[in-house]
Amino acid sequence: MMLYPSIDNLLLKIDSKYSLVTVAAKRARYMQLENDKGVLPSYQSDKFVGKALEEIHAGKLVLQNDDK
């Protein structure tokens, strides 16, 4: 079974699996708690984590480094 978006494509957007999971989990939690419908016009996934991963793949959700 193929998953969308693929992990390979997602790692082109966020270079670390740990960071990818953290960003997706935080966004999914926010969507759930705030009843946020998301920033994309439509989603393939019905679940919050899937929607967050789709937003990362679309470039709508990015990781900002606060390194100084």
Curated annotation (Swiss-Prot):
InterPro entries noted in UniProt: DNA-dir_RNA_pol_omega, Pol_omega/Rpo6/RPB6, RPB6/omega-like_sf
SUPFAM superfamilies: RPB6/omega subunit-like
Enzyme Commission code: 2.7.7.6
Family: Belongs to the RNA polymerase subunit omega family.
UniProt function note: Promotes RNA polymerase assembly. Latches the N- and C-terminal regions of the beta' subunit thereby facilitating its interaction with the beta and alpha subunits.
Superkingdom as given in the UniProt entry: Bacteria
HAMAP family, per the entry: RNApol_bact_RpoZ (MF_00366)
Cited Pfam families: RNA_pol_Rpb6 (PF01192)
Name of this protein: DNA-directed RNA polymerase subunit omega
Catalytic activity: RNA(n) + a ribonucleoside 5'-triphosphate = RNA(n+1) + diphosphate
A GO CC annotation given for this chain: DNA-directed RNA polymerase complex
SMART domains the record matches: RNA_pol_Rpb6
Key words of the record: DNA-directed RNA polymerase, Nucleotidyltransferase, Transcription, Transferase
Primary gene name: rpoZ
Complexes and interactors: The RNAP catalytic core consists of 2 alpha, 1 beta, 1 beta' and 1 omega subunit. When a sigma factor is associated with the core the holoenzyme is formed, which can initiate transcription.
Enzyme class: transferase
GO molecular function list: DNA binding; DNA-directed RNA polymerase activity
Gene Ontology biological-process entries: DNA-templated transcription
